[in-house]
Structure formats: C-alpha cells, structure tokens
Amino acid sequence: MSIFYEEALKFANEHILPYAKEIDEKIEFPVESFKEMGKAGYFKLMVPTELGGLGKGMTEHSEACRAFAKSSATAGLCYMMHNVCLSIVLKYGSEELKNKIVKDVVENNKFLGFAYSEFGSGTNFYLPDIKAEFTASEVILNG
C-alpha cells in the first residue's frame, strides 16, 4: 500500500473508528469524523492546486475512501459522495458556481452531498431526464 493510504488508514483509526458503532446504531451522519476530515484537508483532496486544493487524483481518492470505509462504511461512502459532487461542480459548473462552492470547500471545510434521485433512472444527476416549462409566474417540472 502507498504512504497516502497508510496515512488515511491512521487518520481513520483515530477519527472515524471511535464513532463508527454509534453512528451505525443511531443511523446518524458521522459529524465528528467529518469535522476532522475537513481539518486534515481531505475535503480539498481533489481540488486543483490553482484553486487552493491538494491537486490529487482518483488514486488518492480511492485510497482515502478505502481507508475510511475500513473503519466505517458510512464515513467512506459519504466521503466518496463529497468527491463525486465536487468533481461534477469542477467539470460542469459555471465559473461563478465553481468559485463559490470550491472556495467554501477549501477555506471553510465545507463538504458536499446530493439530495437527488430521478424516477426510473437512478442518480444521473448531471444529465437529468426532466423538462422545465416556464410560465409568467412559475416553473413546472415534469419527468
């Protein structure tokens, strides 16, 4: 295993594992673990260096997910979704959106997540099968 994986595993043993049983039993989000992930810089792992991030890629992302999931599947999955959301913002977001969201990730340790599902298509969040009808007073969504 790589040095990065070993460091992520050490982090997980110290900051995720102590909360794992409780968050699973209470069906809760791993708040304390995520606070520590932010402080340690994991939220900005895949943010390009020119935007203030660590500029790492999929290898480091997958190693962090694997290490975190070894202590808690919940923490590993939630962390993975943060980076999925972040990669979509970086690839498809407007410059205005990128500047706002990425700045919050880098400077304020914000993490991202989806609250999304589309009937019959799973979570194809960047190419939704939905139609918007704009009227004078409202937007009607169908799909």
Protein language model regions, located:
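Internal helix-loop-helix
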Residues: 39, 43-99, 103-108
